Amino acid sequence: MTTVLPPLEDTDGLWAALTEAAASVEKLLATLPEHGARSSAERAEIAAAHDAARALRVRFLDTHADAVYDRLTDHRRVHLRLAELVEAAATAFPGLVPTQQQLAVERSLPQAAKEGHEIDQGIFLRAVLRSPLAGPHLLDAMLRPTPRALELLPEFVRTGEVEMEAVHLERRDGVARLTMCRDDRLNAEDGQQVDDMETAVDLALLDPGVRVGLLRGGVMSHPRYRGKRVFSAGINLKYLSQGGISLVDFLMRRELGYIHKLVRGVLTNDDRPGWWHSPRIEKPWVAAVDGFAIGGGAQLLLVFDRVLASSDAYFSLPAAKEGIIPGAANLRLGRFAGPRVSRQVILEGRRIWAKEPEARLLVDEVVEPDELDAAIERSLTRLDGDAVLANRRMLNLADESPDGFRAYMAEFALMQALRLYGHDVIDKVGRFGGRPPA
């Protein structure tokens, strides 16, 4: 049974004003027809009500984000992951973020028919991540291993293999070999893929028999690429159109979960030997690109220690085409490609082929397709060493400070939430429509 906590001391009256505004929004929604059936006047009326409530959410959280977070996490003694945090906030502070019931209704609808309650989650997460107290604590919570990974770990240590829906993980010769295996959809990303990837990354980092990690796409059954390896087609636009891409469980978890773990490692308890000098378990990572790395696939390459590509591969971040923000690529791509090429890729949708000179800004080695296997093994051997591990840690600290990443992700939380419900995004992905995923 959930319990609503006593309200915070509302000396400035912001909480009372917010709860009243949130109640007014719900009362108005109850009188209106479904999203797509509203008149222009009705759309303007509910937009104004949402805007007033959201302005109050921002003002309330600008002042009280730390107090809210401390209430939810027992003064930062409890580590809540993103989904747990927003669910706890919905219970403890009614009207601050959407309820589970509201979100369940939204999940049953295509993107174009949703009310956009996830925007309120974006407001909340931006405030939490902006905080120098709450933000680092949330990042640490997301660096901890998932319960699913901890459950699978003993079996993986024993057998060296785990088969999941979207990822096959095998330990061989000290290497954790992660193969993305959504063969029917070109490794397009969805919530299941994010969950499987985080589980696989956790297992690779936690297994003491693993020294280096490798990520590669598997062989496809998709008609256009049957029998060929493909790295990743990026976000599943069909699922986005159908309403199956979540702000918290996909877009935010992806960045703060397994991708951040590729950079920083997995955070462990203080009962592990050597914890005092290294609270996180980190390992070097190699990525090998066959075919293409589009969108989220290209974003991934920016956090790997070494990237290989077949000579016929290409890379793109079609953010302008899709209308959304390409994860943390806006933060990272400029370090590799410089400001001009970064803008061409992100703002104009430029595609970079592996044989172009600019590809060497993104890829360490380009080889003929039949030579890629051998190049992978050479790279894995090269990165297997304690000195590599220590230096990649220092390089990552110099390249991307934890506070800089946190500040970026704070703005990303709200900006991406707004993009999800932008009219241009809904129009662009509408051609991928269909029934919502089960």
Swiss-Prot record:
Activity regulation (record text): Inhibited by DPA-S-(N-acetylcysteamine).
Cysteine-cysteine disulfides: none
Binding-site positions, substrate: 183, 189, 222-225, 233-238, 296, 325-327, 416
Known EC number: 1.13.11.80
Keywords: Antibiotic biosynthesis, Oxidoreductase
Enzyme class, spelled out: oxidoreductase
Consequence recorded when altering R254K: Strong decrease of affinity and the catalytic efficiency compared to the wild-type
InterPro entries for this protein: ClpP/crotonase-like_dom_sf, DPA-CoA_Dioxygenase, Enoyl-CoA_hydra/iso
Catalytic reaction annotation: (3,5-dihydroxyphenyl)acetyl-CoA + O2 = 2-(3,5-dihydroxyphenyl)-2-oxoacetate + CoA + H(+)
Ranges annotated as spanning the membrane: none
Coiled-coil segments: none
GO MF terms, alphabetically ordered: identical protein binding; oxidoreductase activity, acting on single donors with incorporation of molecular oxygen, incorporation of two atoms of oxygen
Result of changing V429T: Slight decrease of affinity for DPA-CoA and catalytic efficiency compared to the wild-type. Slight decrease of affinity for dioxygen
Subunit structure of this chain's protein: Homohexamer; dimer of trimers.
Family: Belongs to the enoyl-CoA hydratase/isomerase family.
Protein name, as recorded: (3,5-dihydroxyphenyl)acetyl-CoA 1,2-dioxygenase
